[in-house]
Amino acid sequence: MNNMAGNTPEVVDWFARARRLQKQQLHQLAQQGTLAGQISALVHMLQCERGASNIWLCSGGRLYAAECRAGAALVDEQLTRFYAALEPARDAASSALCWRIACAVWYLPQLAALRKRVRDREIAAEEATGQFSRIIRHLLNIVPQLNDSIDDPQIAGRMVALYSFMQGKELAGQERALGALGFARGQFSDELRQQLVDRIDGQQPCFDSFQALAQPPQTALFAEQCQASLEIEQLRRVACTRQPPADEGETALRWFCAQTQRLEQLRGVEELLIVDLLNAADALLEGEEPEAQLPPADWQEDSIALRLDKQLLPLVRQQAHELQQLSGQLASLKDALEERKLIEKAKSVLMTYQGMQEEQAWQALRKMAMDKNQRMVEIARALLTVKALWRVTPKE
């Protein structure tokens, strides 16, 4: 009964086709990993050019002229590699991926006009930073679309880890640009300060996602080398809580150099993530070489069912994990709302008892949090706890 069909030519053809398609999909997987690596390298070069252009504009054309030229040359060199990596992905790309690539490719030629305006100092530093950031954003948007076509959990996890890390690194790059702008001017407006705070706060969720999915060697290197240095933390405190000194750009260069060193360390981890992704894809490709075009000799319905069960079990576990994550996210959202309420109450206390404006109260809470190396909600909670002990009459 089990051998009724036998190894007929039709059966052999179907197994051979399955092997060929599997190998083709693995080749596409390797190509997607290569494309992600080229995007990462191009984004890093653009971040370098954005930073140099920002200092050039903020210094009134006194500093970083050579760095601007070098940055542009490195970007152009990497662009050639990026376009070459696009070609193998063209035939197998989904419509959604094609849209993302089209948007990025549409913005890239605008670099020439942007560079001319920077070189001639016909553009404000904020606008130049925004245009560089827009180009980078469209390049980064390609990466998650690559992940949608990956059905191997190991490769998918590595791709998400890489994308999360790239997002966090880009926020660190924007932090460098915004901080350099404020320090060079000797003044942080409320809007610029809020933008800086948003970039600082936005990095942690990205790096948390990276650490949850990356391999131990990469997370260990990140923890060892990529945290914000003491100098960065001190300058962050100045930028977020008071106006910087007017020192003809000296503090701006200190900030820029410290942030650049951190970005280069982040790039080192990013390169490890890419190597690990490509190695994992190559290992799958080598491990799936067909040993024969025929099915195994003991192939039968029971063994097929067993293999299907083994394939379904990880999916079930993955769904359970996703549900657990969703529950955790909902709980985190609830906690975040409660924390926000505590901070608002603490602001009200400062406004009532110290006669502060809302912005002043917020800045005071943030400064206390930075000085004590604590979260703002912890300061707010402590303030509300001791409120009952105050014997100060509220100011009119």
Curated annotation (Swiss-Prot):
Any single Pfam family the record assigns to this protein: NIT
Domain NIT residue range list: 37-284
Record domain ANTAR: where: 323-384
Any one GO BP annotation for this protein: transcription antitermination
Keyword field: RNA-binding, Transcription, Transcription antitermination, Transcription regulation
GO molecular function, one term: RNA binding
Protein role: Nitrate- and nitrite-responsive positive regulator for nasFEDCBA operon expression. NasR protein binds to the factor-independent terminator site located in the nasF operon leader RNA to effect transcription antitermination.
Protein name in UniProt: Nitrate regulatory protein
Lineage: Bacteria, Pseudomonadati, Pseudomonadota, Gammaproteobacteria, Enterobacterales
